[in-house]
């Protein structure tokens, strides 16, 4: 109240000092602060910045793969020895770097993540019952964090409807004998405009450990390229946010409109002592080679699928491509066609792999591969990325599958008790009815087991979400009510051949044609 009175009196003084023409006299005084004191506290020792994190704390840890991870702060936690942590992070780095170091030292009790990925120790601890893992769709994870920072306690999303995320029962912790000790709980379901949505609760942390590029001495922060990812929403969602940066600059060095995170969200700040900035998957192209090759010599089956998948692209479309065959299909996009490739880690306008001297640890795709961007590209955070995806702004999603059902159910993220990679962003990518979903895969699994079947036997990624299936044997269109229709058939095969290798019935288009291949 005293401050308001002071401001009020200052404004009255300013007003009374005006002459009849509205000009200010020299004696005018407006009591606005010009102090350089800021609430962000600066540290030189990362251990000092995190030493009060208690056992059992919930930590939000930024990064995507190894891109944009707070290396120095993670190293400091190894030194403090804090334990029984709940770590909220898209994934857990690799076995010997990033959060993988805290897993190895058994300091983490529970991970809330979207992707286990290639971290063998992460998967081993989970399947052996040593670690609790709450697997959450990547876009839902980003939005839960964003909501937590915005004071929104919960929200509805179509992502995960009809899957274990909605139904409950997904393993969070295993017993030593492989049985489920803790399972996820069902989500509340509501219907809006004829579509089903599930209720997801916001996530907040006791502390957030964030990696940024630069900060000014006021505590304002900017990120670099695709290293923004989960770092940005996590800044806003913790009781105490600790940010490590590569450089600290003077106040005024940033134009106000260029600041990514205002100082109000930054409580502690430290300049990292050193950075390894390890690259998880160094992918390069050679000089004069504009595009990567489509596959290894002799991979005729994959080549066939890739060259058919490339025909799904249309000029001007926005597309998100999964790793493997979908991404390789982009190598065959015509130079006369523009397709804007979106990557869920926060890039729009992906280009080819870099030359050796262009590789940048801060610029990767969703497969953690080094990439470049094309003119007109943009970078953004993970929550922004999935707003594009969930909102139906991406025209095409192309991804692989373990199983697809007759009516378009998709399974591609888990084999219970055996393989847990996590759903990553796949559940979000297939959640919008405005986005065409194309599955590319080999027609049969090992031992000629069916992959196209009456009903999926593996946990679903999405329910009735697939629009088209492309295999080396043919192309199916999928109708949510009427099922499959064979529209293209590989030369030399018969419809009976397809029936024998397909685990459900299907219709045959009256306009059945030979399987198309893009010309090269």
UniProtKB/Swiss-Prot annotation:
Pfam families: CoA_trans (PF01144). Its main location: mitochondrion. GO terms for cellular component: mitochondrion. Pathway: Ketone metabolism; succinyl-CoA degradation; acetoacetyl-CoA from succinyl-CoA: step 1/1. Residues 1-39 form a transit peptide. It catalyses: a 3-oxo acid + succinyl-CoA = a 3-oxoacyl-CoA + succinate; acetoacetate + succinyl-CoA = acetoacetyl-CoA + succinate. Its EC number is 2.8.3.5. SUPFAM superfamilies: NagB/RpiA/CoA transferase-like (SSF100950). The modification N6-succinyllysine is found at residues 185, 418, 421, 455. Keywords: Lipid metabolism, Mitochondrion, Phosphoprotein, Transferase, Transit peptide. One of its GO terms (molecular function) is succinyl-CoA:3-oxo-acid CoA-transferase activity. The keyword Amino-acid biosynthesis does not apply. The modification Phosphoserine is found at residue 170. It is found in: Mitochondrion. Homodimer. Only one subunit is competent to transfer the CoA moiety to the acceptor carboxylate (3-oxo acid). Key enzyme for ketone body catabolism. Catalyzes the first, rate-limiting step of ketone body utilization in extrahepatic tissues, by transferring coenzyme A (CoA) from a donor thiolester species (succinyl-CoA) to an acceptor carboxylate (acetoacetate), and produces acetoacetyl-CoA. Acetoacetyl-CoA is further metabolized by acetoacetyl-CoA thiolase into two acetyl-CoA molecules which enter the citric acid cycle for energy production. Belongs to the 3-oxoacid CoA-transferase family. This is Succinyl-CoA:3-ketoacid coenzyme A transferase 1, mitochondrial.
């Amino acid at each position: 109240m005293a401050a308001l009175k002071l401001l009020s009196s200052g404004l009255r003084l300013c007003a009374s000092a005006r002459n009849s023409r509205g000009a200010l006299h020299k004696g005018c005084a407006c009591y606005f602060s010009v102090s350089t004191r800021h609430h962000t506290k600066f540290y030189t020792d990362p251990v000092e910045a995190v030493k009060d994190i208690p056992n059992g704390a919930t930590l939000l840890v930024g990064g995507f793969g190894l891109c944009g991870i707070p290396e120095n702060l993670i190293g400091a936690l190894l030194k403090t020895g804090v334990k029984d942590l709940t770590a909220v992070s898209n994934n857990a780095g690799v076995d010997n770097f990033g959060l993988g170091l805290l897993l190895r030292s058994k300091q983490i009790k529970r991970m809330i993540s979207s992707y286990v990925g290639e971290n063998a120790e992460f998967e081993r601890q989970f399947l052996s019952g040593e670690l609790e893992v709450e697997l959450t769709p990547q876009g839902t994870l980003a939005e839960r964090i964003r909501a937590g920072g915005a004071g929104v306690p919960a929200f509805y999303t179509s992502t995960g409807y009809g899957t274990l995320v909605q139904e409950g029962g997904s393993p969070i912790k295993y017993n030593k004998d492989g049985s489920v000790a803790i399972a996820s709980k069902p989500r509340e379901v509501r219907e809006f405009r004829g579509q089903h949505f599930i209720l997801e609760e916001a996530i907040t942390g006791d502390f957030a450990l964030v990696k940024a590029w630069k900060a000014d001495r006021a505590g304002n922060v900017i990120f670099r390229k695709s290293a923004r990812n989960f770092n940005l929403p996590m800044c806003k969602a913790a009781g105490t946010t600790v940010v490590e940066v590569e450089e600290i600059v003077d106040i005024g060095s940033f134009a106000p409109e260029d600041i990514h995170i205002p100082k109000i969200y930054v409580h502690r700040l430290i300049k990292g002592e050193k950075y390894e900035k390890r690259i998880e998957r160094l992918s390069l192209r050679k000089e004069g080679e504009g595009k990567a090759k489509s596959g290894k010599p002799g991979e005729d089956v994959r080549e066939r699928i890739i060259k058919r998948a490339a025909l799904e692209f249309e000029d001007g479309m926005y597309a998100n491509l999964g790793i493997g065959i979908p991404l390789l299909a982009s190598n065959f996009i015509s130079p006369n066609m523009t397709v804007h490739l979106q990557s869920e880690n926060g890039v729009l306008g992906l280009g080819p792999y870099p030359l050796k001297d262009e590789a940048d640890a801060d610029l990767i795709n969703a497969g953690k591969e080094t990439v470049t961007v094309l003119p007109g590209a943009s970078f953004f955070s993970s929550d922004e990325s999935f707003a594009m995806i969930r909102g139906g702004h991406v025209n095409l999603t192309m991804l692989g599958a373990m199983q697809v059902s007759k009516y378009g159910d998709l399974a591609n993220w888990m084999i219970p008790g055996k393989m847990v990679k996590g759903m990553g962003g796949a559940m979000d990518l297939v959640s919008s009815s405005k986005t065409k979903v194309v599955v590319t895969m080999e027609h049969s699994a090992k031992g000629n087991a069916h992959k196209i079947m009456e009903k999926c036997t593996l946990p679903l990624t999405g329910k009735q979400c697939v629009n088209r299936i492309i295999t080396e044997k043919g192309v199916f269109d999928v109708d949510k009510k009427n099922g499959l229709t064979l529209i293209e058939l590989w030369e030399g095969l018969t419809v009976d051949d397809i029936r024998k290798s397909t685990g459900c019935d299907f219709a045959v288009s009256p306009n059945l044609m030979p399987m198309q291949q893009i010309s090269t």
